[in-house]
């Protein structure tokens, strides 16, 4: 078997102002739930996604009304826009003309070679990449006939066939996904793909389910794949508000130390020793840091047994006991505060840390 190609060794592909592949960086994506032709609703949903950390957004493009709306949508958002195209090559051409940053197609279902060539040439002329989206539930008939059912080998074979179509047309700005609702199948498919080609991989567990069950299923599957050192972008697919997809994706990346722009909460599971309202405090702090785009580790702990030690491991933290708490910053006690103002005092310190991070980041960027 070939050696696994890790994420930092994949081929860099430019998607709008983002570079996908060629580094340790992972990018979070989502997809709108609105009718794309409804520009106002689609833009409003994308703005909500931007606020919680979505970095690339995909919209369905099933007809001309949707294709005709892409330009107006693109002008009003701040992250790269991807058009999802199936079957009709003319919609892909319209999307490219509208200025989208990437198109998602399967070259095999666009039609004859001359149609694929038109799409590829148009994308090449505008430096727009193409994502090949292989899905276990819609593999080509010949693949199913060969293997009997969806397999990781069949999914990779399908991806390679589609890749060859593009490479034969001298097109290499390619990103590939191999999604399945079966977690084990998805893990195996992505592992095999990472050994078969060096194009960036977009990760996902498709049709994973509702917010609760789907979030757990996605975290299990994506976590296993990420732990292999592969994957360059990801989407958590949920039957829920897409904002929830971003929240789960951010937590998955934070768990693996792969998010450079998100705050992380550490809080204890509670027990009979707790003497403060820790669950309420932890939830309030979690909501507060949800939109902070700085790599700050925040601890909320509820007793004197593990609290002080755990809090010292965080950038900022509080260890509560007997209706009051000790505020820690980088391992040192700042002050003691009563429970009534504990959260507000912690928020102030979080804001100070975030501001320091942004100032340092600005200074470093000015030196480049």
Swiss-Prot record:
[4Fe-4S] cluster binds at residues 268, 271, 303, 310. One of its GO terms (molecular function) is iron ion binding. The keyword Oxidoreductase applies. One of its GO terms (biological process) is terpenoid biosynthetic process. Binds 1 [4Fe-4S] cluster. It is an enzyme of class 1 (oxidoreductase). Disulfide bonds: none annotated. It comes from the Bacteria. Keywords: 4Fe-4S, Iron, Iron-sulfur, Isoprene biosynthesis, Metal-binding, Oxidoreductase. Gene3D superfamilies: Dihydropteroate synthase-like, Sulfite Reductase Hemoprotein, domain 1. Belongs to the IspG family. This is 4-hydroxy-3-methylbut-2-en-1-yl diphosphate synthase (flavodoxin). It comes from Listeria monocytogenes serotype 4b (strain F2365). The gene is ispG.
């Amino acid at each position: 078997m070939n050696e696994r190609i890790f994420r930092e060794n994949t081929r860099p592909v430019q998607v709008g102002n983002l570079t996908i592949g060629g580094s340790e960086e992972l990018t979070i994506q989502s997809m709108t739930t609105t009718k794309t032709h409804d520009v106002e609703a689609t833009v409003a949903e994308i703005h909500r996604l931007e606020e919680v950390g979505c970095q690339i957004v995909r919209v369905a493009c099933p007809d001309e009304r949707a294709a005709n709306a892409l330009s107006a949508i693109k002008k009003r958002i701040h992250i790269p826009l991807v058009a999802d195209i199936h079957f009709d090559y003319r919609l892909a051409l319209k999307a490219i003309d509208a200025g989208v940053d990437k198109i998602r197609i399967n070259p095999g279902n666009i039609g004859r070679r001359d149609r694929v060539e038109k799409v590829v040439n148009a994308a090449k002329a505008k430096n727009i990449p193409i994502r090949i989206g292989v899905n276990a539930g819609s593999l080509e008939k010949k693949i199913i006939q060969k293997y009997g059912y969806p397999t990781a080998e069949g999914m990779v074979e399908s991806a390679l066939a589609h890749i060859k179509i593009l490479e034969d047309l001298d097109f290499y700005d390619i990103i590939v996904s191999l999604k399945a609702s079966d977690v084990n199948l998805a893990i195996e498919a992505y592992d095999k793909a990472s050994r078969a080609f060096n194009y960036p991989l977009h990760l996902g567990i498709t049709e994973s389910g509702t917010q609760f069950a789907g979030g757990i299923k996605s975290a299990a599957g994506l976590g296993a794949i990420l732990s292999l050192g592969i994957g360059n972008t990801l989407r958590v697919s949920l039957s829920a508000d897409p904002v929830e997809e971003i929240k789960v994706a951010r937590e998955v990346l934070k768990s693996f130390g792969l998010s450079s722009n998100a705050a992380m909460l550490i809080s204890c599971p509670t027990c009979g020793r707790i003497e403060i309202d820790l669950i309420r405090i932890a939830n309030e702090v979690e909501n507060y840091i949800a939109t902070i785009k700085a790599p700050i580790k925040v601890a909320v702990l509820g007793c004197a047994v593990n609290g002080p030690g755990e809090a010292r491991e965080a950038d900022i933290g509080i260890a509560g006991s007997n209706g009051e708490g000790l505020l820690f910053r980088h391992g040192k006690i700042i002050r003691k505060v009563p429970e009534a103002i504990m959260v507000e005092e912690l928020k102030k310190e979080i804001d100070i840390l975030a501001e320091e991070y942004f100032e340092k980041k600005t200074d470093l960027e000015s030196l480049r």
